[in-house]
């Protein structure tokens, strides 16, 4: 939908990302887009290093937190909290259909001027429908639950550890990690 030049970097490879940013220096704007947690293997993006490169090359940072919202980070604020880059990420996207109870819909957040521009210029947004009130209520309740207590996050961490241990006991070779995505 966008006619901007795109540069693809090797997954989680900061040297390759820097190469792309150097190549993009002549572009009017630069936006680094990444998942916070990669869904295929549970790898966590190196957001601290990505933000450092964004500062160095005057780029915005956009993080998709679909696989992190609600359960990654001390209070469930995702990889942005986990990597200690709160306030350094310009655009955050996520879904209400995974950790927040399976409600439909999603979200994009950022500074007011960015959100205003997206509302005016994003064709998918212009032609989309609002969420049904019961879905909004369900998502808000899920946010309340993960915000008020770490009990559910703690239980998920324990369940993930037991699951990993069980798989390894039965001879499965797993990639290291603590994320609930456990690639087999």
Go through the PLM ranges and name each one.
Residues 75, 81-117:
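Active-site PLP attachment segment
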Residues 155-161, 169-184:
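Conserved PLP-binding catalytic core of the aspartate aminotransferase-like
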Residues 1-2, 15:
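Substrate-binding/gating loop at the entrance of the active-site cleft, primarily
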Residues 105, 122-131:
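A short glycine-threonine-serine/GTX helix/turn-capping micro-motif
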Residues 39, 140-144, 164, 179-184:
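A short beta-alpha structural unit
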Residues 7-63:
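Active-site phosphate-binding strand-loop segment of PLP-dependent enzymes
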Residues 2, 56-57, 170:
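Helix C-cap/helix->beta junction micro-motif
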Residues 134-154, 165-170:
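Amphipathic alpha-helix from the class-I
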């Amino acid at each position: 939908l966008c006619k901007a030049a795109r540069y693809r970097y090797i997954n989680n490879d900061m040297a390759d990302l820097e190469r792309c940013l150097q190549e993009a220096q002549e572009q009017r704007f630069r936006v680094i887009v990444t998942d916070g947690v990669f869904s295929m293997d549970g790898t966590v993006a190196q957001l601290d290093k990505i933000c450092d490169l964004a500062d160095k090359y005057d780029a915005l940072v956009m993080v998709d937190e679909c696989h992190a919202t609600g359960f990654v980070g001390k209070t469930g604020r995702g990889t942005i909290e986990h990597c200690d880059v709160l306030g350094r990420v310009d655009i955050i996207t996520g879904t209400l259909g995974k950790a927040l109870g399976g409600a439909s819909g999603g979200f994009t957040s950022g500074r007011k001027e960015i959100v205003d521009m997206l509302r005016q210029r994003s064709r998918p947004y212009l032609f989309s429908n609002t969420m049904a009130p019961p879905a909004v209520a369900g998502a808000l309740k899920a946010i309340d639950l993960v915000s008020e207590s770490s009990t559910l996050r703690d239980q998920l961490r324990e369940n993930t550890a037991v699951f990993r241990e069980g798989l390894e006991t039965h001879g499965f070779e797993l990639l290291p990690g603590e994320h609930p995505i456990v690639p087999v």
